[in-house]
Design a protein with these regions (language model features):
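Predominantly transmembrane beta-strands of Gram-negative outer membrane beta-barrel pores used
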Residues: 28-29, 36-59, 75-81, 89-91, ...
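Extracellular/periplasmic, surface-exposed regions of secreted and cell-surface proteins
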Residues: 35, 77-86, 91-96, 137-195, ...
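Residues embedded in well-ordered regular secondary structure
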Residues: 1-66, 103-106, 131-156, 169-171, ...
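Hydrophobic/aromatic-rich, well-ordered segments within soluble, folded domains that form packed cores
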Residues: 41-54, 558-561, 689-701
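Acidic/polar loop-and-plug regions of large Gram-negative outer-membrane beta-barrel proteins
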Residues: 15-16, 95, 100-161, 214, ...
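Surface-exposed, extracytoplasmic segments of Gram-negative outer-membrane nutrient-acquisition systems
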Residues: 5-17, 377-384, 422-445, 480-547, ...
């Protein structure tokens, strides 16, 4: 019923006006913040240099109680010169992270925002308190309460992360050096997910614990050579690299709890389910580089690398890639250029080929073992993704050219880069027909082309001993085109949303496009074709929009006064589109302003005039009773009775009415729950934004202060 201010009994039992609640959704939100505080101390002597730092990060979410993150990081770096020929670099970083209530996004049943689309518009947040009774059961609101979800659905995880590496540099001769490096990346994580008993949709409750351990070893050896002969400078290197990654996770879960409000595996009302997860990959490589320079104005570079990855089939496990580049420093070539106005100018160009592998366990399909069917009957379930043992490594070839300039004693700088990239055998996952027994498939997708440019401008408008103001502006534009797809396909579907729109990769179009699955059918004049009931017919899937922006950019400014520096950064995106499932779901649930269309007219016809028959809605009389099709219009057809589609005409399948203007009205519940979703443009939004991404304040402690405490 319309909310026209009538006095009604509220959900708390008190009288209230039936009017939309101001700040209906915004009252749940708050401004989210992320605070970063860091301090570092450096000291250097003739043989030892050391830097010690600490960073504290605290952040929250736009919803109170979600994504409460605390991260403390300690890092130390030291270089020790043992002899004239030998030095050692030591790096270490320890991070402890604690996150309470990571948020769930989109249409997850744990996302409080998703439930807002089911809430009556006269409801206030205050009416949701208390959210449960003395027995722990939710109050009878007849919908999922976001307040319940914020208070009765929790999760937490803690992570310890260690990064460490040691590098040994040994000068074999004046021109020949050896570098050995070993690095460790290790983290340990444990946490839980909890859904209390009596949660709507899961009255039994849910609890899960997990522990994770991951480590990655990296070893590298490189021999480098640098030599100068008169006007020539030569540098070359050869090396090898090995990575060894291992991940293990143990999960324990109960799907039925014995009692509410008790977060523990011992609170088990049925059977504990436990299962492991495993991930591992090894990768080895050999590589070489060479660079030749002449008189500091021309440089030529060549690189080559061969990788072997355990994630690929044995026949395709090895892949080689290389790069070639040349650059000209014009200011070194033409010495007569005044340095006061052009201090540096370089033209560069390069060609490169880069290879890439995939993740763990993407080659062979397996089955999961279960024993809970009909008591203790064992059964096996296949994976949802169809894998393939014929995967090839991805390959990207690129051409790049650019210009770098610095002016006015480096007070201004300009950089321009143009690139053109072709990626072949891109490894992607696509949804497939369920008749195959799988929901999605992994394969090499074909060829994709990217080209575009990036421009960077930097200026220092003001600088003296105590003050300095810097401004850096960046702008980039990327274009893409799908040149071909695997097995001659015209398109592949990445995902489908609400059976209404799809994200597709389509031959001849930008890399990712939005498509409407069953759009309104139209004729050659663009008029919507409807059936006898006035509802639009479904046509063939059509292109909606590209998700790619027209251009992106950023503006960073910094102001220094003595040792104090303030900086801020704007992030810019212009163009591209998003399809809002929130807007779609809100309209389908009759909660959006958009879905008010036709509602009052329908209620007047249905409740006041009692037009329960369909004649008034159809707007026409049965053609078989009216020989002249032009005289069969219902006498009250023009009065709005719901929703209609402007300019729509009857389809050729409607006897006696083909091509005539549609006289029918659609009941709002039919239109907004079924028909509107087929008109993808209704929920399409511009993805452009300008946002303040970062604000920072830094202070360099004067050296004479540190000397007093021994640094």
């Amino acid at each position: 019923m319309p909310m026209v201010g009538c006095q009604v009994a509220g959900r708390t039992g008190e009288l209230k006006s039936s009017v939309p609640t101001p700040a209906y959704t915004t009252s749940m939100y708050q401004t989210a913040y992320s605070w970063t505080n860091s301090v570092s101390i450096e000291r250097a002597t003739e043989h030892v240099s050391t830097r010690i730092g600490f960073t504290n990060l605290r952040s929250d979410d736009v919803l109170e109680g979600l994504n409460n993150l605390t991260r403390n990081a300690f890092n130390v770096r030291s270089n020790v010169k043992l002899t004239k020929s030998l030095d050692v670099d030591l790096n270490g970083r320890y991070t402890h992270e604690n996150v309470k209530n990571r948020s769930y996004r989109n249409n997850s049943d744990r996302n409080p925002i998703y439930t807002l689309m089911d809430m009556p518009r006269d409801l206030s947040i205050q009416e949701m308190y208390p959210w449960k009774d003395e027995n722990g059961k939710p109050t009878a609101l007849q919908f999922k309460s976001p307040v319940w979800m914020l208070n009765e659905l929790s999760n937490q995880d803690k992570k310890e992360w260690i990064l460490a590496d040691i590098t040994i540099n040994y000068k074999l001769t004046k021109d020949l050096k050896l570098r050995l490096k070993a690095a460790l990346d290790m983290n340990m994580k444990d946490g839980y997910e909890f859904r209390n008993m009596y949660t709507p949709g899961d009255a039994d409750g849910f609890y899960k614990e997990f522990t994770e351990k991951a480590r990655n070893y990296t070893y590298e050896a490189m021999l480098s050579y640098n030599k100068t002969w008169k006007d020539f400078n030569v540098s070359a290197s050869v090396g090898t690299n090995m990575q060894d990654f291992l991940f293990k996770k143990q999960n324990s879960q109960i799907g039925t709890m014995a009692t509410s409000d008790f977060i523990s595996l011992t609170n088990n009302g049925a059977t504990i389910k436990s299962w492991p997860e495993y991930n591992a990959k090894k990768k080895q490589a050999v590589y070489g580089t060479a660079s030749v320079g002449y008189k500091d104005f021309i440089y030529m570079d060549v690189t080559g690398r061969n990788d072997w990855s355990s994630a690929l089939p044995s026949d395709n496990r090895s892949y080689f890639y290389s790069s070639y580049g040349v650059s000209f420093v014009l200011t070194e070539l033409v010495k007569s250029i005044p340095k006061d106005w052009l201090s540096y100018a370089k033209i560069r160009g390069s060609y490169a080929k880069v290879g890439n592998d995939t993740g763990f366990d993407q080659l062979l399909n397996g089955f999961s073992y279960n024993t809970s069917y009909l008591g203790d009957m064992a059964w096996f379930e296949s994976e949802n993704k169809r894998k393939t043992n014929s995967l090839k490594p991805e390959s990207t070839t690129s051409f790049e050219t650019g210009l770098d300039l610095r002016f006015l004693k480096d007070r201004a700088s300009f950089s321009f880069t143009y690139y053109n990239k072709n990626t072949k055998n891109q490894i992607l996952t696509s949804t497939i027909n369920g008749v195959s027994g799988y929901g999605e498939a992994l394969f090499n997708a074909g060829e994709v082309k990217n080209w575009g440019y990036e421009v960077t401008l930097g200026v220092v408008p003001f600088r003296n001993k105590d003050w300095e103001w810097k401004v850096d502006i960046n702008c980039a534009k990327n274009n893409s085109e799908v040149v071909s797809l695997a097995n001659g396909m015209d398109y592949m579907t990445l995902t489908t949303v609400q059976n209404s729109v799809e994200l597709r990769i389509v031959k001849g179009e930008p890399l990712v496009s939005l498509y409407c699955r069953e759009p309104w059918k139209t004729n050659d004049e663009g008029q919507v074709l409807v059936g006898a009931n006035g509802r639009p017919l479904s046509g063939e899937a059509k292109f909606l929009a590209s998700v790619e922006p027209k251009w992106t950019g950023s503006i960073r400014t910094s102001l220094r006064w003595k040792d104090l520096t303030f900086s801020a950064m704007l992030d810019i995106r212009m163009g591209g589109h998003v399809w809002s499932e929130t807007a779609f779901q809100s309209s389908r649930n009759a909660q959006s302003i958009m879905s008010l269309g036709g509602r009052t007219e329908h209620l007047f016809s249905d409740l006041i005039l009692n037009e329960g028959d369909q004649t008034g809605y159809l707007g026409i009389l049965d053609p078989k009773y009216v020989p002249n099709g032009k005289n069969n219009i219902y006498m009250d057809a023009s009065r709005p009775k719901g929703m209609n589609i402007p300019g729509a005409v009857y389809d050729s399948s409607v006897p006696g009415l083909a091509g005539q203007p549609c006289q029918a009205w659609i009941k709002p519940i039919d239109y907004w729950t079924n028909d509107s979703g087929k008109n993808g443009e209704l929920y399409l939004y511009d993805a452009s934004y300008v946002k303040l991404k970062e604000i920072s304040l830094g202070y360099n402690i004067p050296k004479n202060w540190l000397r007093k405490i021994g640094f």
